[in-house]
Regions:
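Aromatic-anchored, charged helix-turn/loop surface patch used as a conserved interaction hotspot
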Residues: 3-11, 20-22, 27-107, 152-163
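Surface-exposed, charge/polar-rich loops and edge strands
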Residues: 14
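C-terminal non-catalytic interaction appendages of large macromolecular assemblies
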Residues: 96-163
Length: 163
């Protein structure tokens, strides 16, 4: 789909086309729709970013919690599964899996949402290092960093969707 085609869609079709880029949180796309037309991918991302930033604390926390744990063997969206496979998280050695599981649990306990990281282009070692480095952060810093990662993930997904 082209950006022009996306901009021409009615609200429901627009949300169907790109509402999934924010994991189980189509409200971002639904609100960004009114900012059409989008002259560039940057314009679309800026519109979605602006709507995300206007989200309530409850909406933002729900959006963060909608993401799966990295390296999890739980059910997840096709997009999340493909992204994690690309980073090698589907083929962790038992010790790596145990360490990632332990760090994910510590992170989730401390912050109340899963560790979020835009894994495209990253290795499993990059991800483990980032997770270890971010656990000591304060909650406010980590919420902000998690939202930055969500926006990076959404941008990658939009790049893959639009031609």
């Amino acid at each position: 789909m082209t950006l022009a085609q996306l901009s021409a869609l009615d609200r429901a079709a627009f949300v169907d086309a790109v509402g999934w880029v924010f994991e189980h949180s189509p409200w971002v796309a639904e609100r960004a729709w009114r900012r059409r037309p989008f002259g560039s991918l940057d314009d679309l991302v800026a519109a979605m970013t602006a709507e995300l930033e206007k989200g309530t604390d409850e909406e933002l926390l729900a959006l963060l919690r909608a993401h799966p744990d990295l390296g999890s063997r739980a059910r997840m969206t096709d997009a999340s599964r493909n992204e994690q496979e690309g980073a090698g998280l589907d083929s962790l050695a038992p010790a790596e899996f145990a360490r990632l599981h332990e760090l994910n649990a510590a992170y989730r306990t401390k912050f109340g949402f899963p560790f979020l990281y835009a894994v495209r282009g990253a290795t499993k070692h990059d991800i483990l290092e980032a997770l270890e480095a971010r656990i000591p952060a304060c909650r406010e810093e980590e919420v902000n960093e998690a939202l930055r990662q969500v926006l990076r993930i959404a941008r990658f997904r939009l790049e893959d969707t639009l031609s």
